Regions:
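Surface-exposed loops/turns
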Residues: 7-8, 32-33, 46, 51-52
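Short, glycine-anchored, charge-dense loop/turn motifs used at functional sites
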Residues: 16-23, 55
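Generic structural signal for well-ordered beta-strand positions
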Residues: 23-24, 50
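Glycine-centered coil/turn sites that cap beta-strands in beta-rich domains
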Residues: 1-15, 25, 40, 61
Length: 74
């Protein structure tokens, strides 16, 4: 998934399931302003493949929050 960091600083990317439970943290570090690509391999924090369904990717950065919907189908 493509994303833009508007201002250099802390960027955190989390994936949640439809129940609002955190599935995995994809990123938590300082990034410079610019365009980035982040990939999710469809696995949870324990390395297990998640089930089919709708997931939400939360991108938190200094300029605010963005949420994206991801559908996993096997």
């Amino acid at each position: 998934m493509d994303m833009r960091v508007d201002r250099s600083g802390q960027v955190k990317i989390l994936v949640f399931n439809i129940a609002g439970e955190e599935v995995v943290q994809l990123l938590n570090k300082n990034e410079s302003q610019g365009n980035y690509r982040v990939d999710w391999d469809g696995k949870n924090t324990n390395g297990e493949t998640v089930g089919n369904g709708v997931y939400f990717v939360l991108i938190q950065q200094l300029s605010g929050l963005t949420t994206r919907r991801v559908i996993v189908l096997k």
